[in-house]
Amino acid sequence: MDIHRIHVLRQRGGDVDGLPREVVVKDRESKMRKYLCWLDGPWRGKLAMAARPRGGDWLRDDMASWKRAGIDTVLSLLTPDEERDLDLRDEAGEAKAQGMGFGSFPVPDRQVPRSEAEWAEVLEKVTRALSEGKNVVVHCRQGIGRSGLVAACLLVRRGMSPGAAVELVSAERGVSVPETSEQRDWIDQYAVALASTK
């Protein structure tokens, strides 16, 4: 079924290939929930990893779907160039319009954060939100490399070894994460830095 046609028919309130609009929307909602990879951790809230929401006309729908799926806070790892290219410059506003918190910590695709101190601060904020019982979704472009980096480091922060954290996140995501050896090394380095502060 043509995606553009679905969008136009939904705007007009009509049926899509003989299916009532409500059925199509409900099916889309179930698929959106599948795109959220939930990770249970040692927190009251839940962490989800995801690919970036669709931009442009679809952004509001995807933000609303995340809210209905139980997301309280969105953390984007996209760079400003990616936000522009993917038509996601309004993501913060749309998230807030849905009653969700929004944070941005740009990390270039397939790379690692530029600042260890800023990285630690972001992880502290996410940990605090999760500990308060909030559900947080972290996304990059495909929800693998940079998102996996955040998820693994959050688990390391709570006492898991880097290897076990990577294994768990990879198993839950259904694909090997993170994407690069540099990202994997960053998790090890983060664990060493964390241990030195205790």
Where are these regions (language model features)?
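Cys-dependent protein tyrosine phosphatase-like superfamily
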Residues: 2-6, 10, 18, 22-137, ...
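Conserved G/P- and acidic residue-centered "switch" motifs that form tight phosphate/ATP-binding loops
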Residues: 143
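Short cysteine clusters
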Residues: 140
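Conserved SAM/SAH-binding loop-helix junction
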Residues: 146
